[in-house]
Amino acid sequence: MDPYKVIIRPLVTEKAVSLIEKENKLTFIVDRKATKQDIKRAVEEMFNVKVEKVNTLITMKGEKKAYVKLRPEYNASEIAARLGLF
């Protein structure tokens, strides 16, 4: 799957911002058909980082949300700043 079709948009909520600061995690709304491997590959390719873990869930709205934990050597705050979240 094309990485630019996997990730639809970053999610900016109070919880998402606290996860960036405390747990080095980014939150995205992703394509409903995307697997965890697709999401990992897309984030690594788009942002030039290494992903440690991906957790996904389907929201009540029917969207798929992905929590992407980056490896300790990468900083989620820097990626968020590049995306314009801060």
From Swiss-Prot:
An example Gene Ontology biological process: translation
Pfam families: Ribosomal_L23
An annotated Gene Ontology molecular function: rRNA binding
InterPro entries in the cross-refs: Nucleotide-bd_a/b_plait_sf (IPR012677), Ribosomal_uL23 (IPR019985), Ribosomal_uL23-like (IPR013025), Ribosomal_uL23/eL15/eS24_sf (IPR012678)
Any one annotated GO CC term: ribonucleoprotein complex
Record keywords, A-Z: Ribonucleoprotein, Ribosomal protein, RNA-binding, rRNA-binding
SUPFAM superfamilies found in the cross-reference section: Ribosomal proteins S24e, L23 and L15e (SSF54189)
Keyword Ribonucleoprotein: yes
Record's function text: Binds to 23S rRNA. One of the proteins that surrounds the polypeptide exit tunnel on the outside of the ribosome.
Xref: NCBIfam families: PRK14548.1, uL23_arch
Family: Belongs to the universal ribosomal protein uL23 family.
PANTHER family the record matches: 60S RIBOSOMAL PROTEIN L23A (PTHR11620)
SUBUNIT field: Part of the 50S ribosomal subunit. Contacts protein L29.
Protein name: Large ribosomal subunit protein uL23
Origin species: Thermococcus gammatolerans (strain DSM 15229 / JCM 11827 / EJ3)
Gene that encodes it: rpl23
